[in-house]
Amino acid sequence: KFHAYSTGWGPWAAPPAAGQILLDLRRMNRILEIDAQNMFAVVEPYVVAGQLQAEAMKVGLNNHISGAGAGTSVLANACCFQGGGPDCMYFASPQDSILSIEWVTPTGDILRTGSLGSGLGWFCAEGPGPSMQGVIRGALGGAGGWGVVTKIAIRLVHWPGPAVMPIEGTVP
């Protein structure tokens, strides 16, 4: 029996019973693409929101930062739990920013949603046929998911500020 869980906070951080394995996706931490013209990014599971934000701002774009902070996974916030935060009024809820998902099922099949599933790239959340987004998200995200998400395309928004945020500070 296979059941995928996020390695985030709470009881999902470790296998809950004997005979189970924990997949460590920590090395899957790359931003695979930032498409400035079409305003989206393709990321792996361990890309954190602050990492994506720093790169997106360089091309005049921005992404959602969850209420848990800039050190949380972009992918996990969008497709594995609610991931809300103070900027949801501007960005919409994270799950509404999903454009396409690639995930591996318990049988080893690779499934792709939206336009990616039709071989047309990462640009659109819905493709021909029924939407599969609800299957991977489940009732509350990863707790109801049916596989391991390996890549996600997430919608970005316009960033009117500087390409690099000026940082100043003093030690007390």
Where would I find each of the regions flagged by the language model?
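Short, solvent-exposed beta-strand edge segments and adjacent coil->beta transition regions
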Residues: 38-40
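Glycine-rich N-terminal segment of FAD-binding domains in flavoprotein oxidoreductases
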Residues: 1-28
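FAD-binding subdomain of flavoenzyme oxidoreductases
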Residues: 31-34, 43-45, 49-172
